[in-house]
Amino acid sequence: MAEKTQKSVKIAPGAVVCVESEIRGDVTIGPRTVIHPKARIIAEAGPIVIGEGNLIEEQALIINAHPDNITPDAEDPEPKPMIIGTNNVFEVGCYCQAMKIGDNNVIESKAYVGRNVILTSGCIIGACCNLNTFEVIPENTVIYGGDCLRRVQTERPQPQTLQLDFLMKILPNYHHLKKTMKGSSTPVKN
């Protein structure tokens, strides 16, 4: 499969991205974002822009894929960017296709968030919850349990600043990191 254009991964200074992670397509990673080994970020239907201070854990999959009813060759649809805000946590094994994610959200382990969901800010999608509806999730909503029950919490989840600081210090000791960008569109070679 030949690609039409050069796809690029842009990693801001201050981000920690392990070499063992899989990042494909046009992906921009903001400062102070930590991407664990075995995390996957795939931009096949359009770019993915990840904001500042996000935590993407092992085996999390963030994918900007083509909708089921559109094939990649169908009249070349306009690429739609996936925008991820700041201070979000994508826990182990979660699957996220949401095209717009606000700030301070937590997608817990094994949770699934479909393409037509818009997460505002301060939301928690509980472990193993499957969210595949056409809706905007209101701010500070918690979705939990086997039946995906909902409630509104009074405050947003706290940003994971201490955990990010710890991981930014520890991960480079045990994993090779992808190089950050210095204002260019091509990766820096070793």
From Swiss-Prot:
Could you tell me the keywords of this UniProt record? Answer: Centromere, Chromosome, Cytoplasm, Cytoskeleton, Kinetochore, Phosphoprotein
Its PTM note reads: Phosphorylation at Thr-186 by CDK1 during mitotic prometaphase creates a binding site for PLK1 that facilitates its recruitment to kinetochores.
> Can you list the GO cellular component terms from the UniProt entry?
centrosome; cytoplasm; dynactin complex; kinetochore
Q: Which Pfam families match?
A: Hexapep (PF00132)
Q: What CDD domains is this protein classified in? A: LbH_Dynactin_6
Q: Which residues carry this modification: Phosphothreonine?
A: 186
**Which Gene3D superfamilies does this one have?**
Hexapeptide repeat proteins
Location(s) in or outside the cell: Cytoplasm, Cytoskeleton; Chromosome, Centromere, Kinetochore
State the oligomer form and interacting partners.
Subunit of dynactin, a multiprotein complex part of a tripartite complex with dynein and a adapter, such as BICDL1, BICD2 or HOOK3. The dynactin complex is built around ACTR1A/ACTB filament and consists of an actin-related filament composed of a shoulder domain, a pointed end and a barbed end. Its length is defined by its flexible shoulder domain. The soulder is composed of 2 DCTN1 subunits, 4 DCTN2 and 2 DCTN3. The 4 DCNT2 (via N-terminus) bind the ACTR1A filament and act as molecular rulers to determine the length. The pointed end is important for binding dynein-dynactin cargo adapters.
Protein name per its UniProtKB record: Dynactin subunit 6
